């Protein structure tokens, strides 16, 4: 009964008294049990929620870090790991490359280290990065170049192969749109400013190379005529006149030559070289005088100054002795007639020989002796009286130096009163003037030889005879027994 009572009491109490209590207790218990059972879960949830709560912070921090890493490593740890071990991932296996080699250089970004396909070029500092790094840094870096910290005005987008990067100096890395601009940058920034010693050495090396032409160099590329006029001309201008002057005696002796008159003016402008002053001066003056004497078309003022005045009639007693005798006039005037009948010999070298004999040269100071023949003479009767200063190399000794006094007549001919050569007056000589004419074509001689067929001289004529004049030897006439003895002089 106790048990039943207890049960009833329990039921009653539970029903009457404890109903509310039970109702109250059950939810409490249930709540407590649920709380006790659920508390660990919320704790775990809290811990989990705390972890995720921290995780987003970590994600945010990691996002920031990844952004920085993306700036530095292009996409965080994954790209960083690939960047750290590129050889193990790509270059360990053998590959077979097909296609042609691309010579376009590939540059790597200094921020992410990856090859650049599209450049982001900073203006005005001209440094390049990959376009993503350039844009990202422009947003974060307050428009400052990460390479040089210079302000960036704008960013150009360039494709691979369109830029030329300076690699002469480590750390320069400026880019240019053409090879010419890159070379100008190298010359301006690195060759001049960065290497003064090298520039000095180059300046020392270049000047000797520059005067020639290639090299050279822009200051050496000048017109050749200006160079010849300024540097080499003295010798060339002096050497140029002889060819036309040498040809004048053979071909153009009757024509006025502009190039004959021009070289003296040229020579007056250009100073001759010191080693050949005397030789060149004598040669040119000789040619000038001979041309002016023998070519009557020259200017009258200059020819009149140098030609002897018209001669006075010579004494009559000169004619009988010299008329039939082989007339030996200026040896240079004997040779030219052969040029009408035989091919001209090569002219000897134009070396002047001023005569050392003052008595011979004193009579005709206006003539200088040269081995080269002057232009040939044209038709006129031959001169009769030989000029004293011109009887040089091809005459016998006694004709080179006429006796000072009149020789004794031996064969009935009138005496020849020939004064000494230094007393000859050019005014009294019938000597190669425009009025009287010049040498004629060949004339006969007692020996049967004519000047037209005389052999051409092969070399310089023999030096002038230095013997003293024979005092009593008469001048030979056509009937002189010793005339044949002197024939070798003319053959």
Curated annotation (Swiss-Prot):
A zinc finger (C2H2-type) spans 164-190. Phosphorylated on tyrosine residues. It catalyses: S-ubiquitinyl-[E2 ubiquitin-conjugating enzyme]-L-cysteine + [acceptor protein]-L-lysine = [E2 ubiquitin-conjugating enzyme]-L-cysteine + N(6)-ubiquitinyl-[acceptor protein]-L-lysine. Pathway: Protein modification; protein ubiquitination. It holds the Pfam family zf_Hakai. Residues 1-20, 33-61, 255-491 are annotated as: Disordered. Its EC number is 2.3.2.27. One of its GO terms (biological process) is negative regulation of cell adhesion. A zinc finger (RING-type) spans 109-149. Residues 148-206 are annotated as: HYB domain. Residues 342-359, 372-389, 399-423, 457-478 have a biased composition (Pro residues). One of its GO terms (molecular function) is identical protein binding. Residues 427-442 have a biased composition (Polar residues). It is found in: Nucleus speckle; Nucleus, Nucleoplasm; Cytoplasm. Homodimer. Interacts with tyrosine-phosphorylated SRC substrates. Component of the WMM complex, a N6-methyltransferase complex composed of a catalytic subcomplex, named MAC, and of an associated subcomplex, named MACOM. The MAC subcomplex is composed of METTL3 and METTL14. The MACOM subcomplex is composed of WTAP, ZC3H13, CBLL1/HAKAI, VIRMA, and, in some cases of RBM15 (RBM15 or RBM15B). Also a component of a MACOM-like complex, named WTAP complex, composed of WTAP, ZC3H13, CBLL1, VIRMA, RBM15, BCLAF1 and THRAP3. E3 ubiquitin-protein ligase that mediates ubiquitination of several tyrosine-phosphorylated Src substrates, including CDH1, CTTN and DOK1. Targets CDH1 for endocytosis and degradation. Associated component of the WMM complex, a complex that mediates N6-methyladenosine (m6A) methylation of RNAs, a modification that plays a role in the efficiency of mRNA splicing and RNA processing. Its function in the WMM complex is unknown. This is E3 ubiquitin-protein ligase Hakai.
